[in-house]
Amino acid sequence: MLKNKGHSSKKDNLAVNAVALQDHILRDLQLRNLSVADHSKTQVQKKENKSLKRDTKAIIDTGLKKTMQCPKLEDSEKEYVLDPKPPPLTLAQKLGLIGPPPPQLSSDEWEKVKQRSLLQGDSVQPCPICKEEFELRPQVLLSCSHVFHRACLQAFEKFTNKKTCPLCRKNQYQTRVIHGGARLFRIKCVTRIQAYWRGYVVRKWYRNLRETVPPTDAKLRKKFFEKKFTEISHRILCSYNTNIEELFAEIDRCLAINRSVLQQFEEKYGHEITEEEWEKIQVQALRRETHECSICLAPLSPAGGQRVGAGQRSRETALLSCSHVFHHACLLALEEFSVGDRPPFHACPLCRSCYQKKILES
């Protein structure tokens, strides 16, 4: 009987141990206690059940805008642990078949882990998962002193479904948000900006020095003064107001005026005078009662009753379109010696108008 009882108790212990190990393995494979993975999927059913039991409350809208509280710099630089509360011990851990999970690290222990990471230079190097710089993106520190992007570690836990460090393969690590990479990136940016600014200031100062102080070398000094002379000449040329467009506009305006004057002249004097018009002009000249040539001041024709001698030749008389009468020979001489007039346009000696002439029969 005692043997049977002892044998049965051993079997019961083996069964309990097997069940405990299976339960631990199942819980470990389900992996419901990830550090940075999204917990929203595991809590959907709980939220739905709570929403059914929730009491609705009236919302009073006062019309006032809510004041947005800007996050302080201290809060943005604050470090905090991401791990949820540790799950209760499984049956295998309670029976001592599997060791319990490590306890939560204290602030001093986290400081030691952080110092170890700084000595390794993990924040200076790129993220081991995405191979990119940390810059200002969220950064997490593991309890094994390795550093990753928070989004990269979240994606790694999501697709591997294991809480294992991507580098050292440590299980059930703890995570803490740090800002060492962001701080180093800001220092790097400030250093680069200062370097660019100092370079700009020095280059500007040296360029001004080259433009104001002549060099001591003879060839360089010659080039320096040649450049200065060229700049001064260019400034003098630029100071002159040429106004080429205004000059061209004035030329076009003068040409248009000249064309209009010539067109009016051609309309007025370009056509030939008919016989009827010459008769009217001759009648008008007779009314003037002009008896002497205004050029030579000699009589246009012999006095009445006087005849021209055999050796003398009567002088021809020219009638102009302006109704003035002159000796034809005198008018020809005047046309020949006139400087400003060009044939066939000549000006009358009396009224200074252009004319056409007709020789009158004696």
Swiss-Prot record:
CDD domains found in the cross-reference section: IQCD (cd23767), RING-H2_RNF32_rpt1 (cd16677), RING-H2_RNF32_rpt2 (cd16678)
Location, primary (coarse class): cytoplasm
GO CC, alphabetical: cytoplasm
Record keywords, A-Z: Cytoplasm, Metal-binding, Repeat, Zinc, Zinc-finger
Cellular localisation: Cytoplasm
The organism's place on the tree of life at top rank: Eukaryota
Protein name: RING finger protein 32
Listed SMART domains: RING
A single GO molecular function term of this UniProt record: zinc ion binding
Location of the IQ domain: 186-215
Free-text function comment from the UniProt entry: May play a role in sperm formation.
InterPro entries: IQ_motif_EF-hand-BS, RNF32, Znf-RING_euk, Znf_RING, Znf_RING/FYVE/PHD
RING-type zinc-finger residues: 127-169, 293-352
Family annotation (PROSITE patterns): IQ, ZF_RING_2
Keyword Zinc: yes
